[in-house]
Amino acid sequence: MLISFSALVLASQLVIPVADTVPNFNEERECKIDSASAFDPNAGLNATIKRCMDDEQKAKGQLQTQWSQYAPSDKAMCTGLTTDDAATPPSYVELLTCLEGQQLVRKLPKD
């Protein structure tokens, strides 16, 4: 019985719940961390953060519009990939890029 329970516990950790709505990320935190490494000295830090925030909000809006068009398995995989690194905050741009890539892969001819 102990082995069955252990297998059940392990298997339950492999399931990534996928909501019917776009996940909620902290864009400001992501942009402050990202902008520090992608700093544009010609624009300044505030402009770099603003540009990042604009990109994140645009990607979030696109995700909100198109969320239902993505396959549940793609949403689960891409959400997991986007949120798996505790040191790097999740990004709507990365999530959107992953989902768009998955859609393109599905359109490739099958040999």
Segments and roles (model prediction):
Residues 11-111:
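Mitochondrial intermembrane space
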